[in-house]
Design a protein with these regions (language model features):
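Charged phosphate-binding loop/patch that engages nucleotide di/tri-phosphates or the phosphate backbone
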Residues: 153-173
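Conserved AdoMet/S-adenosylmethionine-binding subsite of the radical SAM
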Residues: 1-10, 19-159
Length: 173
């Protein structure tokens, strides 16, 4: 990473495997910070203890949390038994951290409706930044998702327009 210093100003830590490892993540992040890089952490919000730890240690400069579905259908959408309290706790930790952040939802039409997106926004409440991301079926680990799609561009834009002002910034990606 020292060689890349002329080209890089930050590193993104992403992927559940790295983030969920209590031993590896903070140590790796400390080394990255010692090299003078900023760190963006991508999280699914399932490990609020780790999240608080890296925030408290000053190891993260930006946090992006995937908020995948309304809480009442979260486990169905992610196809796993997620502790919903952890999702809410992570969200609140991020909002109260003083660190720049965003929440984001990737729209898979077969899993989420426009009403679901409105529920997600209400569950998050006000905040810094909310991103609605188009689902790309060509980049998926689960082959079942190759048959899935995202909403039309008009519907995606409407999802942003319906709650202008709730978040300081709403983005369509």
């Amino acid at each position: 990473m020292n060689v890349g210093k002329a080209f890089l100003d930050g590193i993104v830590i992403t992927g559940g495997g790295t983030y969920n490892s209590i031993q590896i993540c903070p140590e790796l992040m400390k080394k990255i910070k010692e090299l003078g890089y900023k760190i963006k952490l991508d999280t699914n919000g399932t490990n609020p203890t780790m999240l608080r730890r890296v925030i408290d240690q000053g190891l993260v400069d930006y946090i992006a949390m995937d908020y995948k579905a309304p809480l009442n259908k979260y486990n169905e959408v992610v196809r796993a038994d997620v502790n919903l309290h952890d999702i809410v706790e992570s969200m609140e930790t991020i909002k109260n951290s003083g660190i720049e952040y965003e929440f984001r939802t990737t729209i898979v039409e077969q899993l989420l409706s426009p009403v679901d997106v409105e529920i997600i926004k209400a569950e998050i409440g006000s905040g810094e930044k909310y991103c609605i991301q188009k689902f790309n079926p060509t980049k998926t680990l689960d082959k079942d998702f190759l048959k899935c799609s995202t909403f039309s561009p008009q519907i995606m834009q409407n999802l942003i327009n319906t709650t202008k002002g709730v978040f300081k910034e709403e983005i369509l990606r």
